[in-house]
Amino acid sequence: MKIIVLLLISLLFAASIAAQSDSQKTKISAEIRKVMDDQSAAWNRGDIDGFMAGYWRSEKLTFISGTDVTRGWQPTLDRYKKGYDSRAKMGVLTFSDLEFTILAKDAAVVLGSWSLARDKDNPHGKFTLTFRKMKEGWRIIMDHTS
């Protein structure tokens, strides 16, 4: 009988830990989603500086697109400003199909799709974002966009 009681207590404890883990994952996903929502809102206002607030402000930030690798927050900002130098080029940004993988309480990966609605075209693609929780909040430390 003692073994059954101990087994039952162990199962309840394990279920409690799993529930807390799922709750934590949901919380982290929501916090990261907020960063991405803020980014798309800034982009859609024509505010590239505001969009970049979601990125780690470090020379170690890595942005990969096609065959190009850009390192550093400022070079990444400069790249965006050069490539999207008008509201027409910026269009309306939408993120979709988001899949969150929580690696630790301070690290996560997001796989998703992006699209720009513009007058003359509608470019779109996929991305993988690596997020880390910093003192300022969740920030993208690596962005691989295609």
Predicted stretch roles:
Residues 2-9:
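Sec-dependent N-terminal signal peptides
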Residues 4, 16-54, 75:
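Short, low-complexity N-terminal intrinsically disordered segments enriched in polar/charged residues
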Residues 48-103, 115-122:
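A solvent-exposed, acidic/Ser-Thr-rich amphipathic alpha-helical stretch
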Residues 95-97, 111, 140:
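Hydrophobic residues on conserved beta-strands that form the core of alpha/beta folds
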Residues 106-110:
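Short, hydrophobic/aromatic-rich segments at coil-to-beta transitions
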Residues 111-115, 130-132:
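Residue-level recognition of well-ordered beta-strand positions that form the cores
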Residues 124-146:
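Short beta-strand edge/turn micro-motifs at domain boundaries
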